[in-house]
Amino acid sequence: MNFLCKIVKNCRDEDTQKPSPASAPPDGDDLWLPPPEYVPLKELTSKKNMRNFCINGEVKVCSPNGYSFRILRHILRSFDEIYSGNHRMIGLVKVVVGLALSGAPAPEGMNWVYKLRRTLIFQWADSRGPLEGEELEHSQEITWDDDTEFVGLQMRVSARQCHIQGRIWCIDMNSRACQLWSDMSLQTQRSEEDKDSSLLLE
């Protein structure tokens, strides 16, 4: 029976050994996607609860026998239950993880590494979201294991408020990249003031 658990299995960088490289997800996989499109920075009408964050995100997938995005989606569907970071920033973390996994991975030993380094504009509805000046340094490993397969998912997200011009993180909730956010049950609503932006509800 497949199950999710947090266990102490580390995806080590094998510097001395030369293991067989992990295979990339097949071309026909339903979520082997190009990076999502961003809209050019524009002046937002509403400044309420809007913050620019300098983001560094990394998602490392460790699987000795290769992996499928279907397994990653299975893991991400339980994100709310397994997330161990600051819950005022869970929405931001979901956005970053989704954007990172929508990019192209780089092989690293037995691992595949997805990285995201951006300055992104986030807006939260009402009084939700991080406190003013609050920063995030979150690192977590989630594993999926059964009798035949092991997949480790290491997530590292750092976010600090900055004054560098950024980009709106998502303008089309029907885009392909948003499938991952749907898997993680990302809670958003369309901004009434700025139709091209989305407000985080978490």
From Swiss-Prot:
Homomultimer. Interacts with nucleoprotein and with the cytoplasmic domain of glycoprotein. Interacts with host ATP6V1A; this interaction plays an important role in virion uncoating after viral entry. It holds the Pfam family Rhabdo_M2. It comes from Rabies virus (strain HEP-Flury) (RABV). Late-budding domains (L domains) are short sequence motifs essential for viral particle budding. They recruit proteins of the host ESCRT machinery (Endosomal Sorting Complex Required for Transport) or ESCRT-associated proteins. Matrix protein contains one L domain: a PPXY motif which potentially interacts with the WW domain 3 of NEDD4 E3 ubiquitin ligase (Potential). Residues 14-33 are annotated as: Disordered. Its main location: virion. A motif (PPXY motif) lies at residues 35-38. Signal peptide: none annotated. Most abundant protein in the virion. This is Matrix protein. GO terms for biological process: viral budding via host ESCRT complex. Gene3D superfamilies: Rhabdovirus matrix protein M2. One of its GO terms (cellular component) is virion membrane. It is found in: Virion membrane; Host endomembrane system; Host cytoplasm. It comes from the Viruses.
